């Protein structure tokens, strides 16, 4: 600080000030002007108006905008131009292997800050509008698991009880991993799984328990110390999902077991749907069991949905053959 203050005085013999320190001081003085619009303060005002956001979304937006602020430094938001936006996207795309959706979310979150600032008259335009992202890599098409995939995975030496239980519930119910991980024994009654909420409105549903799962669920209950069907999971991610770390574990196991990239846990839902369709189960039954809101599998029923008994009969028809059913 002393070198910055006195270095311009004739006869000063102290150390020369560091250039970055000088620049930061200049920025700080500039931003202290009452007419300035520091990016940090504008972002704080922005988030005060974002109370409606889900916790996970707000945390993600906060992190992504803070990362941008660290990159660009102390600036007046009005000084940020399209060249800065373009350079930041290039920086992100070249800084390491990043999924296209992750990059898109980062840019979208920052863009939302500038959209808000423009609507408040703080900036004249949004520099992140029409900033092109790198081309998305060709998506790997997921395929349903066949019996060989299922047997290879479930017989893999490093598989543990929770891995088997989650996989079995998935192939005999079509449930999402997050739904399976959030299942409590309090949600199991009248010989059915009762899912109270989920990814979509139609995710709340009742799924009859396949007879093959009965013994497995008894074992799950005897092992559970927290009331969950899949017990002892460590939550993770922005919103502390129980499935967060477990999903990563299952991915590593699939890779080590030698399953192809096209076979992921979520494609067990495709496996369930395909098997049910091949059995001639009506599509509206499959749709309700899976909690679909896909237009191709829209419910042809009243808003109350189908009665439980027709669904129980449909799910009872499902079989993967003796080898899988006996596991």
List where the protein language model places each region.
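N-terminal helical hairpins
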Residues: 1-37
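Short, aromatic/basic-rich helix-turn unit that serves as a nucleic-acid recognition element
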Residues: 37-65, 95
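Basic, Lys/Arg- and aromatic-enriched nucleic-acid-binding interface segment
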Residues: 100, 104, 119, 123, ...
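Catalytic-site neighborhood detector that most strongly recognizes the C-terminal catalytic loop/helix
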Residues: 144, 197-201, 290-320, 324
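Conserved tyrosine-mediated DNA breakage-rejoining catalytic core shared by Y-recombinases
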Residues: 149, 173, 182-218
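C-terminal catalytic core of tyrosine-transesterase DNA break-rejoin enzymes
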Residues: 168, 172, 179, 267-293
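Short, polar N-cap/turn motifs at the start of nucleic acid-interacting alpha helices
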Residues: 187-190, 260, 281-301, 323-327
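Active-site/catalytic core of tyrosine-dependent DNA strand-transfer enzymes
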Residues: 210-260
């Amino acid at each position: 600080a002393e070198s910055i203050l006195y270095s311009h005085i004739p006869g000063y013999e102290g150390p020369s000030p560091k250039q970055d320190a000088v620049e930061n001081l200049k920025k700080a003085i500039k931003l202290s002007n009452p007419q300035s619009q520091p990016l940090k303060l504008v972002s704080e005002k922005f988030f005060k108006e974002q109370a409606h956001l889900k916790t996970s979304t707000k945390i993600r937006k906060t992190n992504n905008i803070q990362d941008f602020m660290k990159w660009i430094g102390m600036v007046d938001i009005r000084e940020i131009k399209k060249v800065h936006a373009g350079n930041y996207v290039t920086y992100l795309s070249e800084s390491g292997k990043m999924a296209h959706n992750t990059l898109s979310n980062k840019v979208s979150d920052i863009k939302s800050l500038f959209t808000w600032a423009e609507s408040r008259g703080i900036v004249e335009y949004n520099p992140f509008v029409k900033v092109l992202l790198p081309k998305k890599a060709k998506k790997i098409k997921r395929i349903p698991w066949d019996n060989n995939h299922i047997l290879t995975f479930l017989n893999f030496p490093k598989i543990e009880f929770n891995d088997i239980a989650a996989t079995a519930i998935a192939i005999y119910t079509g449930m999402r991993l997050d739904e399976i991980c959030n299942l409590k024994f309090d949600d199991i009654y009248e010989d059915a799984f009762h899912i109270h909420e989920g990814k979509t409105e139609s995710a709340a549903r009742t799924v009859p328990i396949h007879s093959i799962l009965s013994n497995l669920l008894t074992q799950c209950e005897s092992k559970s110390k927290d009331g969950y069907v899949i017990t002892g999971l460590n939550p993770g991610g922005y919103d502390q999902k129980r499935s967060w770390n477990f999903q990563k574990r299952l991915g590593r196991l699939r890779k080590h077991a030698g399953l192809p990239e096209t076979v992921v846990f979520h494609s067990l839902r495709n496996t369930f749907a395909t098997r049910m369709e091949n059995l001639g189960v009506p599509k509206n039954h499959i749709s309700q069991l899976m909690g679909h809101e896909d237009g191709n599998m829209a419910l042809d029923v009243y808003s109350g949905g189908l009665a439980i008994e027709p669904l129980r009969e449909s799910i009872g028809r499902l079989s993967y053959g003796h080898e899988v059913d006996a596991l």
